[in-house]
């Protein structure tokens, strides 16, 4: 495995050729500046000999068909392995769901991004590949963040693409973080990366980014970088800004961020989440409606169990509508425009 990676510098190819395991962990050094550790398939760490003050996680492929972030991360990994760029921050790359990537599908059995914060082991337990992998990914995050001295800034960007078109092509979900201010620097980093829209979540979830935020105090985000396309069919020029900013972060180059101003970004507050309670749940709007579509107050969004679900507030908009989820799961997130909350 080691020689294959040293020869190809293609960690994604190695991962997809061995989607369940790489066998034993292995490590090697790049020049005299970086120790590289491979902990598992899709799990690679860059440890600078003289690390600066940030611990950075870039995860992708939690959903197997969201390919642009996978290609983006593999490009960064390849540049690091080729020593075209040199890591100055401790950096962990996670390719989340290799089995689903090989399958060309969002999932194998279950939505992995609903299985963190221990949800993977709640009944029915570790019964499918996503649950097993989510538990492992949690352990790798724990090992990485605890592998350095306390007091360092912890960052986790969980990269995705959306199943539908969007009024705002690139957007981020800021996990619920009671008692902690939102980071002005992080919001402006996202803006510089081309992610000009931020949703502030209103409650705990079982997403990967919430796990890192809540358990480790990380500046963590679920970041949607555009629309789903098959592997190799992404227009990677649309991700130049994001790739450049991630590279600057990892290599400790100046970020040159603008000061925070609410008029430079689109801010939304999650006002409610609508879950599915009956098999007959259906939306009233077209299946191809774009993310951030708004509806007038009183508009009937959906019907289930003989009841109507209506828009409750003026200027309420929606993201991630999906009626074809299991009972108990989220069908849509509802948003309202937000004045900047506690941003510092």
Curated annotation (Swiss-Prot):
Cofactor, free-text remark: Binds 1 zinc ion per subunit.
Positions of Zn(2+) binding: 63, 66, 160
Cofactor requirement: Zn(2+)
GO terms (BP aspect): arginine catabolic process to glutamate; arginine catabolic process to succinate
Highest rank taxon of the organism: Bacteria
Residue ranges that the Swiss-Prot or TrEMBL entry lists as coiled coil: none
InterPro entries: AspA/AstE_fam, AstE_AspA_cat, Aste_AspA_hybrid_dom, SuccinylGlu_desuccinylase
Pfam families registered for this protein in UniProt: AstE_AspA_cat (PF24827), AstE_AspA_hybrid (PF04952)
Active site: 224
Record bears the keyword Nucleotidyltransferase: no
EC top class, as a word: hydrolase
UniProt pathway annotation: Amino-acid degradation; L-arginine degradation via AST pathway; L-glutamate and succinate from L-arginine: step 5/5
Database matches in CDD domains: M14_ASTE
MF terms in GO: hydrolase activity, acting on ester bonds; succinylglutamate desuccinylase activity; zinc ion binding
Keywords per UniProt: Arginine metabolism, Hydrolase, Metal-binding, Zinc
Keyword Protein biosynthesis recorded: no
Reaction(s) the record says it catalyses: N-succinyl-L-glutamate + H2O = L-glutamate + succinate
EC number in record: 3.5.1.96
Record family assignment: Belongs to the AspA/AstE family. Succinylglutamate desuccinylase subfamily.
Reported function: Transforms N(2)-succinylglutamate into succinate and glutamate.
Protein name (Swiss-Prot/TrEMBL): Succinylglutamate desuccinylase
Gene: astE
